[in-house]
Every structure is written in structure tokens, then in C-alpha cells.
């Protein structure tokens, strides 16, 4: 039996729309991500478990893990009879890379079970393709960090889908999911088709400055550059309470605050545990909207998807 855990991820990280992503895991050891188990069988089967299993499609063939198995078998040129179990621990439409978790765990589990016939670049390419079936377009800002770990800059060049960006050991990422769903397609549709020149210049400056600050280990500069002029100004209207949370983050002393992916999850970066706890407490009391919501204090997950058994 092979069991793979794939961690949650922050798409965009404010400053890098569609080209930057970061994997995160709670500091308390909670598994914030999906697991897929594979065991040998006489015929294919897929069973769903986990806290958010009720949100999955009724038709098994619409389940992205089924599609991962189907695509992997196509790549291998044969049907591989296995019993799959998806532990859906991630809310769908949360902005935490939920579909990426399932895709990464599903494909990596099949690859491990079959003795790693596919290399990392090939497998990552397939992950982006499968993710595209869910979100409507091929993109790697969730699957790359989820699979490889840490913070990933998406390059999409032959042989270089992404490259690792060094993070900051002191940073704590407070993640708050309010318990409501935001459709990625809807969040994309709200964005303008064209941007003003000054916004393009600001975006280029912010992203270049952030990447430079990461590589030269200047955390205060990196935090200053974490500004989103591409998506956040438009998506805020889809996120009840985000503007108040961003102001609270500033008042409490967080280094930066932004939308995780297309939302509704937000993240706040803090450089000490006391500030992170205060931020988490505020979000727990003011940003969560129902019992499905949660807050986790996280660090960058540098390991990425990994074997649990």
C-alpha cells in the first residue's frame, strides 16, 4: 500500500498572480491537505473519506482522482487495477489549492505504486494538465508548491516548469478559511481583460523586488513588496470581511496580508508567534462565517507531497 499526503498551498502569494505559489502546513502538526492511498486490486475502485467528502461530485468519473488514475494509465499504455482511497481534508473552492492537493496526491501515489516510471518534470506537467480540468486553464501555482514544497516561481519553460524561491524561517503564515465557497472561474471572470500601464509597471516592480529580497534574505523588503495590483482590487468584493481583516492585520502588526489564490481564504504573514496568535484570534472571531471555517498558524512546507505509508 502507498499513501501520499499533499499539503495546502497559497496561489499568487499576493505579488505573483499565476506565477508564484507556496506550500504551507500547520505548526501544530495538523495535516492540512489531502491523502490518497493505493493498494493492489483485481479491478479499479475509488472510495472517498474525510471531513469534506460531502462536497465531492456524486459521479465517480467526475472525481479528479479518478481522472488522475485514467490519465496515468493512458501514459503507461495499460489499465492498472488498483483500489484508491481519497481522504478529502480540504474544502473545495477555498483558495487553498484543494483540487491541486487531490491531483498531486493522486498522480504521485500512482507513480510511487508503479515504481516511479515518470520523472518529476513529466509528472508535474501532468499535474498542471489535470488541474486545468478543474480550474479551466492549465496553471502550476498550486500544483508545483504542493508537489515540490516551499515557494515556487512558475516559469513554464521546456524542462523548467518551476524554480524554488527561498523563504524566511521566521515567517508564520496565518491562514483563515471563512467557510464559504468562491468559484475560481467566477473570481477570474471578475478581472479586467486589460490593465493600465502603471499597474503593469507596479506589478513587475513588486514581483521582481520580492524575488530579489527572498534570494538575498531581506524579509522586511520582501514583506513590503507583497502587494497585489492585479487581482485583489477586484476580488475584494467577492470576499465579505476581507477589507476589515486586512486593516486588522495592519493594526495587529502583521507584515503582510492577502488573498490565498482566488479566496475566500486569506493569509497574514507574521514574524513572531505572539503576533500570529493575536492575528489568529481576531480572524477566528471576526472572519469565520460558519462551523466549516478554520484558522491555522502555518509555516512554509518545504517537503511538499510525501509518502506517509
From Swiss-Prot:
Q: Which Pfam families match?
A: GHMP_kinases_C, GHMP_kinases_N
Q: Which GO terms describe its molecular function?
A: ATP binding; homoserine kinase activity
Task: Quote the record's binding site residues for ATP.
Answer: 91-101
Q: Name one GO biological process term.
A: threonine biosynthetic process
Pathway the protein acts in: Amino-acid biosynthesis; L-threonine biosynthesis; L-threonine from L-aspartate: step 4/5
**Cell compartment(s), UniProt:** Cytoplasm
Q: What is its main location?
A: cytoplasm
Give EC number(s), comma-separated. 2.7.1.39
State the UniProt keywords alphabetically.
Amino-acid biosynthesis, ATP-binding, Cytoplasm, Kinase, Nucleotide-binding, Threonine biosynthesis, Transferase
**Xref: InterPro entries:** GHMP_kinase_C_dom, GHMP_kinase_C_sf, GHMP_kinase_N_dom, GHMP_knse_ATP-bd_CS, Homoserine_kinase, Ribosomal_Su5_D2-typ_SF, Ribsml_uS5_D2-typ_fold_subgr
Which Gene Ontology cellular-component terms appear in the entry?
A: cytoplasm
- What's its top-level EC category? transferase
- Write out the catalysed reaction: L-homoserine + ATP = O-phospho-L-homoserine + ADP + H(+)
Functional note: Catalyzes the ATP-dependent phosphorylation of L-homoserine to L-homoserine phosphate.
Family that this chain belongs to: Belongs to the GHMP kinase family. Homoserine kinase subfamily.
The protein's name:
Homoserine kinase
Origin organism of this chain?
A: Yersinia enterocolitica serotype O:8 / biotype 1B (strain NCTC 13174 / 8081)
Taxonomy of origin reads:
Bacteria, Pseudomonadati, Pseudomonadota, Gammaproteobacteria, Enterobacterales
